[in-house]
């Protein structure tokens, strides 16, 4: 979608009454039409060209969905990005309303947008839904991945976010049933040391700065945030996921995490990176890193990380472990009593990484 200004002064002077953005900016869309709608079908603009790059563009599609619902049609069906399942800028209230709306009778999901729109990469995949005014009940959900369709009748609001893979539901329920503290309680927010992405090293300094082009010196007196972490062994991961636009590789598998390394004491980083843990012990930091590299952990992160961004929220299903020891996938599968089928599902979705 383009901003209204992009349509030009001439178009505005001619009074383009059907301009899409008039529809989403009115409190009562019924006033725009002299008729009632029994059926509304659409593929709305996905984002607003706000003058920045694609990463900063604001989602727009949810506004069309919300306004269309206000028209109270008998049936509403729209094709929209699937990022709303667990992320997206400004989509929290939309996600809550969608997951709690029992009038959504069907939801069809495509992990890869190219299965729906050949040649088109849409971060997090694509979906379409059927909303029925007179319906109230569970949703008939279908996920399409690697040419396979998995169907499940379910309530959409089991969690605060939506789990797209039916096979993952059982795995997550086994893990969450133990009520263990999860890693989202320790993973840093963006800018763990208060440094934006465009910060570069200085000519001199007591610290070593890790930034997107390498490392360099940085003055300690410029660090205000995260000073208590400077002398820790820190586990650093990239804010961007490994997958281009959140899409799987050609084999349909995900690596999930990209750059991962340990920052020793006196090393810091910009907001290009997050800290996934830290310790006074190098060995414990190494064990945290090994845990992050397991397929088990990256699978759980992938259930929330449906786009190209990794945030602390993506670790909400990842249980904390005793990091005085290293963990293997086999030990984790046994600890959480995963079945052979559940293990195969994880193994076939997540690419291996060297430990």
Question: What do these predicted ranges mean?
Answer:
Residues 1-106, 112-116, 125, 129-138:
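SAM-dependent methyltransferase catalytic region
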Residues 31, 35, 113-340:
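C-terminal substrate-recognition regions of SAM-dependent nucleic acid methyltransferases
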Residues 49, 85-86, 244-246, 353:
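Flexible loop/turn segments at secondary-structure boundaries
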Residues 77, 342-345:
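A generic structural-conservation signal
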Residues 344-355:
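Short, amphipathic C-terminal "tail helix"
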């Amino acid at each position: 979608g383009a901003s209204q200004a992009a349509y030009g002064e001439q178009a505005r002077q001619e009074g383009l009454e059907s301009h899409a953005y008039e529809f989403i900016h009115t409190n009562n869309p019924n006033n725009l039409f002299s008729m009632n709608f029994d059926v509304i079908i659409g593929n709305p603009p996905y984002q607003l060209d706000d003058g920045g790059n694609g990463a900063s563009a604001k989602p727009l599609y949810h506004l069309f969905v919300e306004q269309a619902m206000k028209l109270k049609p008998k049936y509403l069906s729209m094709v929209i990005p699937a990022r709303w399942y667990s992320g997206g800028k400004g989509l929290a209230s939309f996600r809550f309303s969608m997951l709690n709306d029992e009038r959504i009778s069907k939801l069809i999901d495509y992990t890869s947008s190219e299965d729906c729109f050949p040649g088109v990469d849409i971060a997090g995949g694509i979906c379409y839904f059927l909303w029925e005014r007179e319906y109230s009940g569970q949703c008939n959900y279908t996920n399409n991945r690697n040419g396979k369709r998995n169907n499940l009748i379910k309530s959409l609001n089991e969690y605060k976010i939506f789990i797209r893979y039916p096979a993952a539901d059982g795995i997550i329920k086994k893990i969450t049933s133990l009520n263990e503290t999860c890693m989202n309680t320790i993973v840093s927010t963006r800018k763990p040391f208060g440094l934006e992405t465009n910060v570069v090293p200085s000519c001199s300094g007591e610290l070593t700065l890790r930034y997107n082009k390498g490392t360099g010196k940085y003055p300690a007196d410029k660090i205000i945030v995260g000073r208590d972490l400077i002398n820790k062994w820190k586990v650093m991961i990239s804010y961007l996921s490994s997958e281009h636009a959140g899409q799987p590789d050609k084999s349909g598998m995900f690596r999930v995490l990209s750059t991962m390394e340990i920052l020793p004491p006196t090393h810091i980083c910009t907001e290009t990176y997050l800290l996934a843990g830290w310790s006074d012990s190098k060995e414990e930091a190494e064990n945290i890193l090994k845990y992050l590299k397991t397929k088990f952990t990256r699978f759980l992160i992938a259930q929330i990380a449906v786009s190209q961004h990794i945030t602390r929220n993506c670790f909400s299903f990842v249980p904390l472990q005793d990091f005085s020891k290293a963990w293997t996938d086999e030990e984790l599968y046994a600890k959480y009593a995963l079945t052979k089928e559940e293990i195969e599902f994880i193994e076939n979705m997540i690419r291996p990484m060297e430990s």
